[in-house]
């Protein structure tokens, strides 16, 4: 297992990975930037690998409090995450969206 804490836009790995996990990043990105970074990071994923991207769902009971404190995120639905992945050329057969038990955090799973 390797952990990288780096600028996601400048990161240039020397190899590909079996798993790429990203939490706390993509929900800050608008749709255009999300797609650009997703497409880039897919190139770092081995054939047969999996990418998991966390994103806050529309079902966030603390959203008003977060935004009152100037913490603004792009909350997305499972359907939006699937559409974004499809727009990046990923087959819907290779896409799955799961959530944790409260349904506040979504996880976009993409297999390559």
Residue ranges and their predicted role:
Residues 1-15, 32-36, 40, 50-112:
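Class I (Rossmann-like) S-adenosyl-L-methionine-dependent methyltransferase catalytic domain
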Residues 18:
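Conserved acidic residues
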Residues 21:
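A conserved beta-strand element that flanks and buttresses the S-adenosyl-L-methionine
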Residues 25:
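Hydrophobic adenine-recognition pocket in adenosine-nucleotide-binding enzymes
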Residues 29-30, 45-47:
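Helix-to-beta-strand junctions that scaffold the AdoMet/dcAdoMet cofactor pocket
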